[in-house]
């Protein structure tokens, strides 16, 4: 389980990215790089990281499912992820 403070920080960054998305796009299209530099650092989408939806783990994230490899494996073995089953050949 990730620290609650890290999970909250990621939520705050995602909210800031969403808040400034239109303004960033307009400044970028106009080529106003000084204006872009004046925006908050957290307004850049590059600073946002993917985290597991269940426990907030930042590493080994699978985008298609929104889970880390550990939780994906656990839920897949239980059969709780539709369309996923163990490979056999």
UniProtKB/Swiss-Prot annotation:
Keywords: Ribonucleoprotein, Ribosomal protein, RNA-binding, rRNA-binding. One of its GO terms (molecular function) is structural constituent of ribosome. GO terms for biological process: translation. GO terms for cellular component: cytoplasm; small ribosomal subunit. Binds 16S rRNA, required for the assembly of 30S particles and may also be responsible for determining the conformation of the 16S rRNA at the A site. Part of the 30S ribosomal subunit. Contacts proteins S3 and S10. Belongs to the universal ribosomal protein uS14 family. This is Small ribosomal subunit protein uS14. It comes from Oenococcus oeni (strain ATCC BAA-331 / PSU-1).
């Amino acid at each position: 389980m990730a620290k609650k403070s890290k999970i909250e920080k990621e939520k705050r960054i995602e909210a800031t990215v969403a808040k400034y998305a239109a303004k960033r796009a307009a400044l970028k299209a106009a080529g106003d790089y000084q204006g872009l530099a004046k925006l908050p650092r957290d307004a850049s989408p590059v600073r946002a990281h993917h985290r597991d939806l269940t426990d907030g783990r930042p590493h080994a994230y699978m985008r298609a499912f929104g889970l880390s490899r550990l939780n994906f494996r656990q839920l897949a073995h239980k059969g709780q992820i539709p369309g996923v089953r163990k490979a056999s050949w």
